[in-house]
């Protein structure tokens, strides 16, 4: 299946405690169907001390399910993603709401 959400996309959270917040995807895990979004779904983790890293409680982003996020269109509203094949044979992502091409 083609990737509808990719690294670098600006997304909005559709459900959960961060509903309505936007952020940038910095990692996608297609095998698990999850993504990491900067500043979204931040949890506290107890970090054991190592030689290079100090121990303590750290905050980090936890994966969020791909079904709970949507790409933000040019109008600032969430949009679904479709695919279109151009005349030169190149496959591009298209916003279903506006029909505009999605960069990336």
UniProtKB/Swiss-Prot annotation:
Q: Which Gene3D superfamilies does the record associate with it?
A: 2.30.30.30
Could you state a single Gene Ontology molecular function term? structural constituent of ribosome
- Sorted alphabetically, which SUPFAM superfamilies does this protein's record hold? Translation proteins SH3-like domain (SSF50104)
Q: Has UniProt tagged this entry with the keyword Iron-sulfur?
A: no
One CC-aspect GO term: ribonucleoprotein complex
Per the record, the domain of life is: Bacteria
Q: Which GO terms describe its biological process?
A: translation
Q: Spell out the PROSITE patterns in the cross-references.
A: RIBOSOMAL_L24 (PS01108)
Keywords linked to the UniProt accession: Methylation, Ribonucleoprotein, Ribosomal protein, RNA-binding, rRNA-binding
CDD domains according to UniProt: KOW_RPL26 (cd06089)
**Which InterPro entries does the protein's record reference?**
KOW, Rib_uL2_dom2, Ribosomal_uL24, Ribosomal_uL24_CS, Ribosomal_uL24_KOW, Translation_prot_SH3-like_sf
Q: How does it assemble?
A: Part of the 50S ribosomal subunit.
Question: What function is annotated for this protein?
Answer: One of two assembly initiator proteins, it binds directly to the 5'-end of the 23S rRNA, where it nucleates assembly of the 50S subunit. One of the proteins that surrounds the polypeptide exit tunnel on the outside of the subunit.
The family line of this record is:
Belongs to the universal ribosomal protein uL24 family.
- Descriptive protein name: Large ribosomal subunit protein uL24
